[in-house]
Amino acid sequence: MMDFYNGWLEESIRIEKTVNEAPRVARGKSLNWVRTRQDSRAALMIAPETGFPTGGSLLMRAEIPVGWHTGKHIHGEEAIYIERGEGFLLLDEKRYDFRRATVFHIPYRSTHQLFNTGNEPVSYLSGLAWHLEAFIYMGHMEQIEDAGQNDSAGLAKVPREESQYWPTDGRRISIHEEQFDLSTETKHGATYFLMGRSGKQNGFKATAVAISSIFVDLPHSKSHSHAHPEAYLYALQGSGYSEIGGKRYEWDQGDAIHVPPGMMHHQHFNPTDHDMRELRFEYGIRYWIVDQWKGYTTIDRHMKATHLDD
């Protein structure tokens, strides 16, 4: 009979094999859309349920029909990007308006709900660390209201937005595209910081999950190359390919790219005549492990974006 220690050794081998053989790209055109109590239409992209070996995190896409709202619930931290549409977020009974490219950070266990007040469906991306929270038996999710049609009389009673900040401790809740912070870095054609790599930039206070930045890769160029623990990219615009762990992975607008846990070297390439834009999600668990061993410190091989032929 196998003892517990040999079981651990075998588990270590299995983990490495799983990460090496796992998918790297979630295809936006092949998603399994479902209706849930929270969303009229939602699909997991990068998640354990879809075969990705994440560090307890996930990326989801969801849509809110015209004249509808999401459910109202509470759970751990969440980072949201509005890909299309307009409306507002109610967070702890305070209103925060949104439009295309607005980014939200939902504090831990704050009640929240999204409302579509525009003339087209709202499409949004959501990053969560639900699986990690559940694994350590601290995952609490509570549904207060279900998704459904807006009540016009109720909407009329909602006060106007007062601030983009949370009155509880002053942290930032929302940021709009014109407020993104253009960096002087040369690792891509351009880099815009949102919550930043620490999750603390531009007034945010993200711990478990952050939308750190947007990368712009120019036509016929390649990004810098490096290795670090887990991160996600979502293709906002354009098409290209990434080299991760020595293998090439093609992707198009609407796809999501998974740089898995570990230290796989990776680089992103734009072989087209148009700009590429990638939205970057990162999760705080990576810094917990980075602080324990210098082998997980980011390793940069090429510090600047260059032409494809260089």
Walk through the language-model features, giving the residues of each.
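A short, N-terminal "cap"/entry segment at the start of jelly-roll beta-barrel domains
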Residues: 1-55, 139-208, 293-297, 302-310
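Conserved short histidine dyad/triad with adjacent acidic residue
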Residues: 41-47, 58-74, 195-200, 211-227, ...
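Short histidine-centered beta-strand/loop micro-motifs
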Residues: 48, 54, 69-74, 115-117, ...
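Ligand-binding loop in jelly-roll beta-barrel domains
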Residues: 53, 99-102, 108-135, 261-288
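Glycine- and acidic-residue-biased ligand/ion/polar-headgroup-sensing regions
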Residues: 65-66, 75-88, 92, 218-220, ...
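Short acidic-glycine-tyrosine-enriched beta hairpin
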Residues: 79, 93-108, 246-262
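Long compositionally biased, domain-poor regions of proteins
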Residues: 113-116, 199, 215-225, 234-235, ...
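C-terminal functional regions that serve as terminal interaction/effector modules
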Residues: 210, 233-234, 247, 256-271, ...
